[in-house]
Structure formats: structure tokens, C-alpha cells
Amino acid sequence: MTLAFDEIQDDKIFEDLTAEYFRDLKDSPDNNITNVEVKASGEGSDGGRDILIEIDISDDIKVFKRKWVIQCKFREDSISTTHLKGINIPTLIHSYNAHGYLLVCKTRPTSGVTELFERLNEKCKDQYQYEYWNGTQFLKKILLMESLHQTFFPKYFNYVQSIKNKKK
């Protein structure tokens, strides 16, 4: 059995998983994150912002902040630019005084989206960052974050526990 999004039932749970992933980042010894503040958009139209995160990072001299606008797309098909229409991403980033925009996908973005993000990264006069995680990338990150398994992937968690118990 492998970790898969099959256990995630809908877009709200996918957003919750994404938010919890960022909340749990501060507990990881593999980074210099000292605090993470997560703000979900709530029910209704979100205008392209599902989650707003503010991360405090220490470089051993000073703590600095990074703010990201995150949009989650829990769809079976690839995410195309039509799924992002009606959102002026640079304006959205600016309106939240953020550093960048992260698109988290269940599947993957189309070449149109990846090319759009490449152009925005190269030519954005405000030097905002435009990133995406496809489903495989996000699953790899989640796999390392065992604190999320029991809540969001109970079948996978039970499978792993049964293997661990057999080894005892």
C-alpha cells in the first residue's frame, strides 16, 4: 500500500491537509522555521486564496518573515489556466502583502500553467514568487510528515502500524 490521495474525500479536507502540513513544519528539525501562522479562507468564494501562511525563519542572526498565498486544487483533471481565470495572481499577492503564490494540486498543472508561472517568475517587477506543487511532490512531502498520516490517511497509517507491529 502506498500513500495516495484516494483517502482524501473532498476539496475541504485537501485544504485542511495542506494547512496542517504547514502548521507542522515548525516541528520539523530539518528546517529553520520557528513559527507558522495559518489562516484559512473559510466557506464560500475565496478569490484565489484558500490559505494564507506567514512563516518565521531564523538564519541564526535574525528571524525574518515570509508570507504566501496558497490555492489548493483537488481535481481529477490537470489544472489549466482556465481553472485560474478570474484571478489576477500578482494583484492577489500584493493585496495580502505576500512574497508569493503557491498552487497545490492533487494531480498536476498543465504546461500552460507551468509556462505562466515561469514567465511570472522571470518578469514580475515586484519579484513575487510563483510556485506549484503537483500531487506527487506534495505526497512526497506528506510522506515525511508522519504526524499527518493518522488523521488524513488512516488506512495507510493502519497499514504501516501493522507492519511495525509484525516486526516487534
Predicted regions and their residues:
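Mixed-charge (Asp/Glu-Lys/Arg
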Residues: 1-168
